[in-house]
C-alpha cells in the first residue's frame, strides 16, 4: 500500500450536514482555515512520523476537528465521524457504543484526553473490515 487514503473536505462537509439533519444544530462553517488545518494534521503527522499507525492518524483527525471547532455546531460529532470514515477508507471499522463515543469525544474536545491516549482508545476499538 502506498499510503493511507485521506479524507476529502467535501466528504466531511457532507457527513457534517447529514449529522446536523439527523441530530440538529446550527448549520455552517465557522472558519474554513481551521477546517483545512484539522484535515492537514494527519498528513503532517505522517510526514514527520512515517511509522504512525492508522489509529494515530485517525486520532489526529479527531483531535484537530474537535479542538479547532471549524463548524458552527456539531464539531465533536464531525470529529468522531471523521475518525470512523478515515478508518473505514483504510480497511478498519470503529466499534463503539453511542455512550462511549460521546464520552471519548468530550474528553478529546476538552483537552482532558491527549492525542496519544485517544489513539490508544482507537486501537482498542477497531476491527479489520
Predicted stretch roles:
Residues 1-129:
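FIC/Doc superfamily catalytic core
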Amino acid at each position: 500500500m502506498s499510503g493511507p487514503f485521506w479524507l476529502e473536505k467535501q466528504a466531511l462537509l457532507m457527513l457534517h450536514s447529514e449529522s446536523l439533519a439527523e441530530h440538529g444544530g446550527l448549520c455552517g462553517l465557522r472558519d474554513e482555515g481551521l477546517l483545512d488545518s484539522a484535515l492537514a494534521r494527519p498528513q503532517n503527522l505522517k510526514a514527520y512520523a512515517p511509522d504512525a499507525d492508522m489509529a494515530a492518524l485517525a486520532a489526529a483527525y479527531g483531535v484537530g476537528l474537535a479542538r479547532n471547532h471549524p463548524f458552527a455546531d456539531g464539531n465533536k460529532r464531525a470529529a468522531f465521524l471523521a475518525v470512523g470514515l478515515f478508518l473505514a477508507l483504510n480497511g478498519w471499522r470503529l466499534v463503539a457504543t453511542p455512550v462511549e463515543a460521546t464520552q471519548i469525544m468530550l474528553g478529546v474536545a476538552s483537552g482532558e484526553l491527549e492525542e496519544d491516549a485517544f489513539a490508544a482508545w482507537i486501537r482498542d476499538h477497531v476491527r479489520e473490515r
